[in-house]
Structure formats: structure tokens, C-alpha cells
A protein has these predicted regions:
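Conserved SAM/AdoMet-binding glycine-rich loop
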Residues: 59, 67-70, 232-352, 360-361
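Short acidic (Asp/Glu) and glycine-rich catalytic loops that position anionic groups and cofactors
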Residues: 266, 301, 336, 374-381, ...
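Short flexible coil/turn linkers enriched for glycine and charged/polar residues
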Residues: 187-189, 200-201, 292, 302, ...
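Terminal RNA-binding accessory module
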Residues: 383-478
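Structured core elements
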Residues: 193-195, 240, 269, 295-299, ...
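Short acidic, glycine/proline-rich loop/turn micro-motifs
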Residues: 308-311, 379-383
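Proteins enriched for Cys/Gly/acidic motifs involved in redox and nucleic-acid/cofactor modification
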Residues: 1-242, 281, 292, 296, ...
Length: 478
């Protein structure tokens, strides 16, 4: 999602006549698009700020900012100004007296293309996170919510920048289409990340997303397809549809079918789905549509009914097994990857064994193991003390890793001599080729006369010739 958010910020700034650059050294302004899912992600921001020269202005946006703005009352116990309560605020400008700047609901409603608007400064008890960061790094100039990207031109005027912006200002993040801006980290990447929704209503006990991104909002089918067309016209080959619960969109099946029809598309993927919102028709498309990648990433989080219930996941372990059976019944082999939260509070040894059992049954190709991170304001933060000893945590992680290594090794053996397609995302100096296959496995093509003419971001057919744990080796079929 951060890739898609960053593309929208870059697009608005480009239309304000700002020029994107590749390195910090070239930049006048460095923008941090932050994540708040785990505390470690927020801690990384502090580490990265140390690397920015003081002559560079710094802006910070993303979930860390949205979460801290939205939940100031939860975290500090201080009364919020009315403007903050209703969400009618667009940024924190760091002047001598830090203040939130924004537009009232009525001003937003009456805003027209020709109206440059006037930002209203509102004094309030300043957020401790913003205060501490801005006191430590004097080059921080602006904090803003990613939802308010459409009002960046007005914020920049308030900061004294000369802004030329001839497009309609919008308070709807989803309507900003990043024309001519690739949504990947590399400007020449052939993958585009397209959000089809934002926010979440699930309120899992551990998850900060509903607090950081708000309640779920679904974007119109026409808008999503329009954005996909723009990316494909710019040379993109792979599209990834994004949503916190991506397949909960009421028109998700229609979106998938419409994008699959678009000229120039080679691969289509989506993340992250939820097991209880899968339709049999969607699964059937994985079997019949060659452009819909043979890979499903499904974040089960645990194999224990007791833990799933404490997490408020809304499904049982038995439903996980049933869903896996449906995937395995398809005639087209599908790679399955998952997320597992380790060390969730009060997870017993019996609970952990149930997760190992699910892993063995599903034969996951990859598990993204997330160490439980306590997030302020969540139900787990308020109700579930973390009482699992460190030694036990370490043992459980090692056990799950050992099991995953064995399963990955066995799964990858079955790939040998299979023919697949891959995307090239790195070419080494010795001309070894690195990339990933349509079923999301890392692959290496060793340097040979056949690889001499390959280019970065190419899609090409390959034959698997060798397996390793978590990696494959192959040769191009050209």
C-alpha cells in the first residue's frame, strides 16, 4: 500500500512543478511515507532521519502520522480540538508555534478549482510524537495525513512555496490517479500497485490499521479500471490490486474480470484477501485465467481456534483447512503463502502446535513470520498482557522456521523441469539474472550466452533446472 500512497504523493507534487529525483543528495525535500503496523517500522523512521543532511527539508506522512493524529486522545488523555475530532484537518505545519492547519467541512464542500483557498491555523495541545521529532530534527517542515494528499498544494502555499497547480483540488484520496508515475520504488519497474479500498472494519485485536487508515472505503470499479489502463499504457506488465481485505470489495470479482481484459496486461495479483470472503468463482478464475497468477497470499495468522478467537479474526481453524482444500482441488497448481503472528499474548504450547499442524497441512511456500508488536489503542494493548518468556518465543520461532525450511525444500523439488514465466528485477555485474516467477518464487538464471541480451523488468519464459530452499535456478526459453 505504501507504494501506491507514494505514487499519489509524487503525482500531486509533480503537478505542482516539483521534480522527482532518485537520491537524497539531489533532493531539496525528503518525504517519509511511514508504516505503523509494528513498532519496529516506526523506530526505523528515527534511524533514517539521522541519515538526512540538515540542509534538506523533511516531510513525514503515512500511517504513523494518521495513527498519531487520529488517536491523540487515546495516547495522551488530552482533549482534542473539535476540528481534530471531526477529521477536518490536513496537516501539521512546523512554524514557531506548531499548529494544525486545515479546512472546515463547509470550506471543503465549497472548494472550487479556481479557489486557492486559505488554510486555517488551529492552536491545540501539540502531539507528543510530532513535538519530539521536530525538536530533535529541526529540518522537519511538515507532517500530513496520506488521506489529505490532494490538499498538498494548499499546504505548500501555507509554507511559502510558489505553487502552480491547475487541477481540481480533492479531499478524496482515491480519486488521485498517479498518471505517469510508477507505483513501485523503481521508476522503471513494470509492476503497478492499485488500491481498490482503504481502511478496515475488522478491528482485529492486534491491528492498528482501522485506527491509522479509518473505516473501510471501497473505490468505484470504473476508477480502478481507469488507473489500470493508465499504468498499462505507460508500459506496466504486472498489476497488483490492494486492500486491507481486498476480496471484501462488493465488486471484487468484477474488478478482477475487467482488469484481466485490458490490453498489455501480463500478470494480475491481489493482496491481502480474507478466507471468509472468497467465492468459488474467484478461485475458479485462478484455474482458467492464465494472467491471474497461480499464487495466493492468505494471512491466516494462527492455526489455533483459541488464538484466532482472541485475535477477533472471525473464522476458525477448520475454515482455514477447508479453504486450503479448495485451493488444492484446482487443476492448476497454486502456490500458497501466509502471515503468522508469533508470540501472540497467552499463546500456549498447544496453540502453537496447532499452527505447526496447519503449516504442515497447507505446505506453505513461504511464511512471513511477524513477531507480535503491541500497538497503542488496540484491544490487545488494553486487555492482553504479553507474558510469554523470551526463551519460549525463541524456541517457537526456531521450530516454525525449521518446518518451513523442510516444506520449502520439498515443494521446490517439485518445480524442477517445470516451465514458468518470470520477471527480471536485477541483473548482476557478472550477468546473473534475478527475479521471481508467476507463482512468486525467487529465481536465478546463471550467466550464459542465453542471458546476454536480457533486460531489466523483462517477462520471459523459463525452465526450472535446480532447486534450493526458497529459491529456484533456471534457464531462459528464448
Amino acid at each position: 500500500m505504501n507504494y501506491a500512497d507514494t505514487a499519489r504523493v509524487k503525482s500531486v507534487l509533480k503537478n505542482c512543478w516539483f521534480t522527482p529525483v532518485e537520491t537524497v543528495e539531489e533532493a531539496d525535500i525528503v518525504i517519509f511515507d511511514t508504516c505503523s503496523v509494528r513498532q519496529k517500522s516506526e523506530d526505523k523512521v528515527t534511524g533514517k532521519l539521522k541519515e538526512i543532511p540538515l540542509d534538506k527539508k523533511v516531510w513525514i506522512t503515512g500511517c504513523m502520522i494518521q495513527h498519531n493524529m487520529r488517536n491523540q486522545k487515546i495516547m495522551t488523555g488530552k482533549k482534542l480540538p473539535e476540528n481534530l475530532k471531526t477529521g477536518n484537518f490536513w496537516g501539521v505545519v512546523l512554524t514557531k508555534e506548531p499548529r494544525i492547519v486545515g479546512l472546515t467541512s463547509e470550506e471543503v464542500k465549497n472548494l472550487k478549482k479556481s479557489d486557492k483557498g486559505e488554510l486555517v491555523g488551529i492552536n491545540h495541545s501539540f502531539n507528543p510524537l510530532f513535538h519530539n521529532l521536530s525538536q530533535k530534527w529541526k529540518n522537519i517542515e511538515l507532517f500530513f495525513r496520506i488521506d489529505d494528499t490532494g490538499f498538498l498544494p494548499l499546504m505548500l502555499q501555507k509554507l511559502g512555496y510558489e505553487v502552480r497547480y491547475d487541477r481540481e483540488l480533492t479531499n478524496e484520496y482515491s480519486t488521485i490517479v498517479p498518471e505517469g508515475i510508477n507505483s513501485s520504488m523503481n521508476a522503471h519497474n513494470k509492476t503497478a500497485y492499485i488500491p481498490i479500498s482503504t481502511g478496515c472494519n475488522q478491528f482485529c485485536a492486534y491491528c492498528i490499521v482501522p485506527f491509522a487508515r479509518g473505516l473501510e472505503r471501497w473505490f468505484p470499479v470504473e476508477q480502478i479500471v481507469k488507473e489500470a489502463k493508465i499504468h498499462l499504457a505507460n508500459g506496466v506488465k504486472e498489476i497488483v490490486l490492494l486492500g486491507q481485505i481486498v476480496n471484501k470489495h462488493p465488486d471484487f470479482l468484477t474488478i478482477v474480470k475487467e482488469v484481466l481484459k485490458l490490453e498489455g496486461l501480463e500478470w494480475l495479483r491481489y493482496t491481502s484477501p480474507y478466507p471468509t470472503y472468497y467465492s468459488d468463482e474467484l478461485l475458479a478464475l485462478h484455474e482458467t485465467e492464465p494472467k491471474l497468477c497461480p499464487h495466493i497470499h492468505i494471512p491466516f495468522q494462527s492455526g489455533s481456534n483459541a488464538v484466532l478467537k482472541k485475535m477477533f479474526r472471525g473464522y476458525s481453524a477448520e475454515q482455514c483447512y477447508t479453504f486450503i482444500d479448495k485451493i488444492r482441488s484446482l487443476k492448476r497448481p497454486i502456490s500458497i503463502t501466509t502471515d503468522i503472528i508469533l508470540w501472540f499474548p497467552w499463546e500456549t504450547e498447544e496453540d502453537f502446535q496447532e499452527t505447526l499442524k496447519l503449516t504442515e497441512y497447507a505446505r506453505f511456500d513461504m511464511i512471513y513470520m511477524w513477531i507480535y508488536s503491541n500497538r497503542p489503542g488496540t484491544f490487545a494493548d488494553r486487555k492482553y498482557p504479553d507474558e510469554i518468556p523470551y526463551k519460549v518465543k525463541h524456541q517457537r520461532r526456531s521450530q516454525l522456521n525449521d518446518l518451513l525450511y523442510r516444506i520449502s525444500d520439498e515443494n521446490n523439488q517439485l518445480e524442477v523441469w517445470a516451465e514458468r514465466t518470470m520477471i527480471v528485477n536485477e541483473i548482476a555485474e557478472n550477468w546473473d539474472i534475478f527475479g521471481y516467477t508467476d507463482n512468486m518464487k525467487q529465481i536465478i538464471l546463471k550467466s550464459s550466452p542465453k542471458t546476454a541480451n536480457l533486460e531489466i523488468w523483462m517477462l520471459l519464459p523459463v525452465r526450472i533446472t535446480k532447486w534450493m530452499v526458497f529459491k529456484l535456478e533456471g534457464e531462459p526459453l528464448l
